[in-house]
Amino acid sequence: MESLHLIREIVENITEAADELRSKGRENLDHMEFGELLAYAESLCIIQDAFTGRDLAEIGLAFDVDKRYLI
């Protein structure tokens, strides 16, 4: 399924960007960077919600976004 591959690629790109920010440590992020991290997390949550009832592992989102990026 080409559309599923595209969604997985989008998720990978967002996750990579969010992981890069997370690696700095939340306490070291400035307001702009923290805003970016929030936006990435919200984007991933929106995609998760759209895939409710499906296997999130298929698109690389089988994790708790809030715990990974915000808590």
Where are the regions that the model predicts?
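N-terminal acidic leader/helix
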Residues: 1-34
